[in-house]
Amino acid sequence: MSTATLEKAVAAKAPRKQKVILAEGNEAAALGVALARPDMVSVYPITPQSSLVEHVAKLIADGRMDADIVDAEGEHSVLSVLQGGALAGARTYTATCGPGLAFMFEPYFRTSGMRLPIVLTIVTRDGITPQSVWGGHQDAMTVREAGWIQVYCESVQEVLDTTVMAFKIAEHHDVMLPVNVCLDGNYLSYGASRVELPDQAVVDEFMGEKNVNWHVALDPLRPMAVDPLTGGTTGKGPQTFVRYRKGQCRGMQNALSVIEEVHADWAKRIGRSFAPLVEEYRLDDAEFAIMTLGSMTGAAKDAVDEAREAGKKIGLIKIKTFSPFPVEALKKALGKVKALGVIDRSVGFRWNCGPMYQETLGVLYRLGRHIPSISYIGGLAGADITIPHVHRVIDETEALLNGAVAPTEPVWLNEKD
C-alpha cells in the first residue's frame, strides 16, 4: 500500500473535525439530545433545569431538532405523556430536578417497571426545608432505588457526550431501562466551558437503527396487557410481579457491560473517551485514596496533584455510574488502597453518612479486608467543595495509615465556612 493510500485510509477512520463552542451544561445537554434525534420531548421548567428545556424548545423551534414537544401542566404529566409516546415506539426525553422529580414519583417508578428507555436529565438540586434552589445530589439520591440507571457527569463536555450515549444504553436489547443523566445544578448547569460538537453523521452511525421498545410498542396486531394489576394471593399475580422485578434487576446488571461497550464505541468513533463506570486517577501506586462524584472531581484532581507534588501517595476514584453500582470495578480500584475518604454531596439519613459512602461500605465488605474509611459530606445547597476542603480530606485520610481512628460520625466540610 502506498503512503498516500495509507494516509487516506487512516484519515477515513479518524474522527472528523468537530465544531468547538462555548456552552453551559444545560445547553450542552440540549445539544446532546438533539444529536440523538428524539421523536418526542415533554417538559416543565424548574430551577436550575429551566434553561435546559428552553434550549430544547428553541432547537425544535429553529428546526435543528425534529421532535414533537408537549408542554404539560406539571412533572407528573410530563413523564406520563412520555410513557405513552414510548409505548408507541418513540424515542423520548425530558429533564427535571428537586420538587419536580418528587412530583413525578409515581410515573417515575412505572417507567422502569414497564422497561421504557426514556432518558431524563436530573439537574441535581438539594432538598427542601430549609428552602434551597441550589445544587446538591439529594434529589437524585432519593430515587436511586427506583430502577433507573444513573450516571453522573464531571464536566460540560461529559454532559453532552453522556447524554447521547444514554439513549443507546437505554435502548439496548439487554437493558431496556430508563436512564438519568445527572449534572450538578449551578456548577455544571450554568457553568460555561469549551465543548466539542461531534458531527451529526458520525453520531447517526454511532446510534445505528432505532430500536425503541420492540418489546412493548403498542401494535393492534399484537395485543398485550401493559402495566397489569398483579400481586395478591390468588392466580399468577405474585409470579408475574416477581418476573417484572427480576427482569428489572437483570437489565440493571446487564447495563454494566453495555455501558462499557457503548463508551468504547463512542471513543472509537468520536475520538474522545470517559471512564464508563469508575475512573482511576493517579491510583497505580497510591496507598490511600479519596472518592468523588460529579463536578467536585475537578477540584479534587487538582488537590491530588498538589498532594502528589508534596510526596503523598494519594489517588482518586471517581464514580461515573452510580446505578447500577459498579461493584466489581470498584473492588478492582480499591485493590491496593489502605485508607479511603469518600466525599458525598447529599445525606443518607438512615445510616448517618453519605449515600455513596454507604454503598462503598458494601463493596469494602466484599473485598474481604478492612480498609479504614471516613464519610465526608459537603457541597450541600450549592456550597463549594474547594481545593482546601479536599486537602483536609486527603490529610485526614492519610492519618488513618498512621494509626488514627476513623470517626464514627460523618465529617461536615462546610459546617464552619
UniProtKB/Swiss-Prot annotation:
Keyword Phosphoprotein: no
Reaction(s) the record says it catalyses: phenylglyoxylate + NAD(+) + CoA = benzoyl-CoA + CO2 + NADH
Stated regulation of activity: Activated by magnesium ions and thiamine diphosphate.
Keywords, comma-separated and alphabetical: NAD, Oxidoreductase
A molecular-function term among this protein's GO annotations: NAD binding
Matches recorded under Pfam families: PFOR_II, POR_N
Induction section of the entry: Induced anaerobically by phenylalanine, phenylacetate or phenylglyoxylate.
Class in the EC hierarchy, top level: oxidoreductase
GO biological process, one term: response to oxidative stress
pH dependence remark: Optimum pH is 8 when measured with benzyl viologen. Half-maximal activities are obtained at pH 9 and pH 6.8.
Residue intervals passing through the bilayer: none
Disulphide-bonded residues: none
The keyword Transferase is assigned to this record: no
EC number assigned by the record: 1.2.1.58
Function: Involved in the anaerobic metabolism of phenylalanine and phenylacetate. Catalyzes the oxidative decarboxylation of phenylglyoxylate to benzoyl-CoA and CO(2). It can also react slowly with 2-oxo-3-methylbutanoate and use different electron acceptors such as benzyl viologen, methyl viologen, FAD or FMN, but NAD seems to be the physiological electron acceptor. Also catalyzes an isotope exchange between CO(2) and the carboxyl group which proves partial or complete reversibility of the oxidative decarboxylation reaction.
Subunit details: Dimer of heteropentamers composed of an alpha (PadG), a beta (PadI), a gamma (PadE), a delta (PadF) and an epsilon (PadH) subunit.
PANTHER family: PYRUVATE-FLAVODOXIN OXIDOREDUCTASE-RELATED
NCBIfam families assigned: PhenlGlyoxDHPadG
Protein name: NADH-dependent phenylglyoxylate dehydrogenase subunit alpha
Organism: Aromatoleum evansii
Gene: padG
